[in-house]
Amino acid sequence: MKNKIKIRLKSFDHRSLDQATKEIVSAVKRTFATINGPIPLPRKIERFTVNRSPHVHKKSREQFEIRKHKRLLVIDDPNPAVVDALSKVDLAAGVDVVIELENGE
């Protein structure tokens, strides 16, 4: 069977995430490997509600949220040139990258 490399990208800023995705896709396409994606995964939104005043006025509150954006890239049947190209890609500081190697047996 074929091996696969799954690349999962996470970021709070969707613009930097899209830029990192474009850089990875272009690096992989230069090695003539087949790539599936970018597949947008569901974003996760965390909301926090806090009181505006520490003493009274319980009804006066403020709400904050954190949005986590995610993308998935799958490289089918990678060769050593793909791994070398991925190691040379320079990404933005706010993008978290998780790379998984999957053996298709």
From Swiss-Prot:
SMART domains in the record: Ribosomal_S10 (SM01403)
Residue spans crossing the bilayer: none
Keyword terms: Ribonucleoprotein, Ribosomal protein
GO cellular component annotations of the record: ribonucleoprotein complex; ribosome
GO molecular function: structural constituent of ribosome; tRNA binding
Domain of life: Bacteria
Cystine bridges: none
Alphabetical list of InterPro entries matching this protein: Ribosomal_uS10, Ribosomal_uS10_dom, Ribosomal_uS10_dom_sf
GO terms for biological process, alphabetical: translation
Family: Belongs to the universal ribosomal protein uS10 family.
HAMAP family hit by this protein: Ribosomal_uS10
Subunit structure and binding partners: Part of the 30S ribosomal subunit.
Known role: Involved in the binding of tRNA to the ribosomes.
Protein name: Small ribosomal subunit protein uS10
UniProt source species: Rickettsia typhi (strain ATCC VR-144 / Wilmington)
